[in-house]
């Protein structure tokens, strides 16, 4: 499946999610938090309005951590702002902060963040550029996590490892948004994957497409009770 997904933050200002939905957008990834203290002032409103528009909704955190302990603290802060949220798309950690350029291997930091999300029962994915995935986030220990890759100006990403979403433009024009937005394509049926695995504190809905253990394993989950 190929579905259109936007990532939305306070930068977009007022968003008419009903018009966004009518323009063919399937889901939105909403910026929730950054660092250990920043909560996006637009997150709650964007969440409520996106749900009312019947969009699939996920959330992301902009990582500032430079150590494993800081990553865990940021993940817990992120989680604290997601209580009672019905999220049918992944929780993403956005790794691209300028201060992280000097860190050669970000894998332990990324893994610590995602492990914290998974221990809390959520579906985790890592967002970054293809360049960073090839260099700073290339360690095998991250292969058990899903990826949301970013590369603009190409017909196909220059990346060989599996990924679930590809952000292909930072200049999408979508009805309901003043100005530009980042647009991705989702290749996976995240709502079904997440519900069937009992993640994001969601319960399976019937009827639902049956999901195989092999498909779940391909997403990085080695032991899942169906």
Task: List each language-model region with its residue ranges.
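Substrate-binding cleft of extracellular glycoside hydrolase catalytic domains
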Residues: 1-22, 26, 30-123
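Functionally critical loop-and-helix segments that line ligand-binding/catalytic clefts
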Residues: 1-11, 140-208
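Short beta-strand/turn micro-motifs composed of small residues
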Residues: 61, 128, 151
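Structural recognition of alpha->loop->beta junctions
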Residues: 79-93, 97-99, 136-163
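Short, low-complexity, charged amphipathic interaction modules
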Residues: 202-226
